[in-house]
């Protein structure tokens, strides 16, 4: 009787574990890609190839929450190698132009004019100045960014780099890779860097 009970228990546990394995098995990437790509089509400058993931995106998809430290370090190292600083060595532009870029959410959508420069839409995620009360909180407040950190060459380089490719500093961050993905030009990134660091900028008042 005992043997029959144990055998029955084993069958039940095996069946349960099999169901759990099936339920936990993720959809094959190819199946997901087929469904996603079937749901989109090219419209203007918004192309379906935006669904193609690079190594950084694949790793962030594979480890969406608690990722191993080694994976996070790998992602940051990959993106640090992709960093491009201005050839002229100048990292600061005009903060007034930077404010315009931070306020603008135009760009890269199918309905946008591709000949117009894109904006950074920085206020959608960050507080920057005291005057602008419409801001998001997905990202940290950047108010007094330069006032708190100073305006050294190292800080300028970090700030420019963070805007150009934030994945080099924080693996799987929500912040877009503005320079790496050609959302903003080098000149625009200089302007936004100045917005954050110039002592005359409203960010630092």
Q: Which residues does each PLM region occupy?
A:
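Generic anion/oxyanion-binding catalytic loop in active/binding sites
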Residues: 86-87, 111, 178-181
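Extracytoplasmic electron-transfer domains, predominantly the class I c-type cytochrome c fold
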Residues: 30-31, 38-41, 93-97, 123-124, ...
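Local sequence-structure signature of Cys/Sec-based thiol-disulfide redox active-site neighborhoods
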Residues: 110-121
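Post-cleavage N-terminal segment of exported redox proteins
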Residues: 3, 14, 19-108, 162, ...
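Secretory-pathway/luminal and periplasmic proteins that interact with or process carbohydrate-rich
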Residues: 108-111, 131-135, 202
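Positively charged n-region of N-terminal signal peptides that target proteins for export
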Residues: 1-7
């Amino acid at each position: 009787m005992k043997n029959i009970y144990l055998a029955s228990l084993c069958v039940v546990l095996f069946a349960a574990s099999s169901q759990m394995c099936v339920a936990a098995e993720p959809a094959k990437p190819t199946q997901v890609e087929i469904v996603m790509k079937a749901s989109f089509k090219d419209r203007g400058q918004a192309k379906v190839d935006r669904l193609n993931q690079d190594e950084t995106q694949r790793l962030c998809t594979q480890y969406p929450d608690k990722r191993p430290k080694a994976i996070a370090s790998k992602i940051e190292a990959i993106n640090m190698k992709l960093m491009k600083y201005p050839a002229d060595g100048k990292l600061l532009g005009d903060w007034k132009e930077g404010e315009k870029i931070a306020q603008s959410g135009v760009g890269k959508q199918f309905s946008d004019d591709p000949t117009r420069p894109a904006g950074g839409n920085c206020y959608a995620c960050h507080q920057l100045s005291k005057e602008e009360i419409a801001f998001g909180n997905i990202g940290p407040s950047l108010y007094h960014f330069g006032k708190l950190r100073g305006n050294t060459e190292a800080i300028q380089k970090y700030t420019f780099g963070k805007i150009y490719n934030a994945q080099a500093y924080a693996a799987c961050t929500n912040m877009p890779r503005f320079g790496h993905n050609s959302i903003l030009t080098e000149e625009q990134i200089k302007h936004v860097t100045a917005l954050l660091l110039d002592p005359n900028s409203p960010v630092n008042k």
